From Swiss-Prot:
Heme b binds at residue 98. It is found in: Secreted. Gene3D superfamilies: Globins (1.10.490.10). Disulfide bonded trimer of chains IIA, IIB, and IIC. SUPFAM superfamilies: Globin-like. It comes from Tylorrhynchus heterochetus. Giant hemoglobins of worms are formed of a monomeric subunit and a disulfide-bonded trimer. GO terms for molecular function: heme binding; iron ion binding; oxygen binding; oxygen carrier activity. Residues 3-148 form the Globin domain. This is Extracellular globin-2B.
């Protein structure tokens, strides 16, 4: 499968360990918020989906908690890249969750990828954007498959 090959998965996992490992817990909120800021800069309409978690008050605990939940979902997906069956089950679960949320659109996942590809290289010394593009596409394609 050349869409997120074994080499790509290795690169993504290696990059991710350097970004999201336990030693960096203090910066997780900042990284997550930077990703969302970039998403909202790309598409201000995406903000509307997050009204119930205080998106307009980035210093509020409920927004920070939501940011961490989203990035932890990415963390889980990235760490399941080597286990395709478990990954598929997790992505189906995430797809269901996103289908049930009013206003979530497939295009937001494309924009989230652009945001990730802009922010993550700033916190990873050897970021492989090609591998991330291919593997995030594999993840996002399942989640957004039934979204408008």
């Amino acid at each position: 499968d050349d869409c997120c090959s074994a080499a790509d998965r290795h690169e993504v996992l290696d990059n991710w360990k350097g970004i999201w490992s336990a030693e960096f817990t203090g910066r997780r909120v900042a990284i997550g918020q930077a990703i969302f800021q970039e998403l909202f800069a790309l598409d201000p309409n995406a903000k509307g989906v997050f009204g119930r978690v205080n998106v307009d008050k980035p210093s509020e605990a409920d927004w920070k908690a939501h940011v961490i939940r989203v990035i932890n979902g990415l963390d889980l997906a990235v760490n399941l890249l080597e286990d395709p069956k478990a990954l598929q089950e997790e992505l189906k679960h995430l797809a269901r969750q996103h289908r049930e949320r009013s206003g979530v659109k497939a295009v937001y996942f494309d924009e989230m990828e652009k945001a990730l590809l802009k922010v993550l290289p700033q916190v990873s010394s050897h970021f492989n954007s090609g591998a991330w593009d291919r593997c995030f596409t594999r993840i996002a394609d399942v989640i957004k498959a039934e979204l408008p």
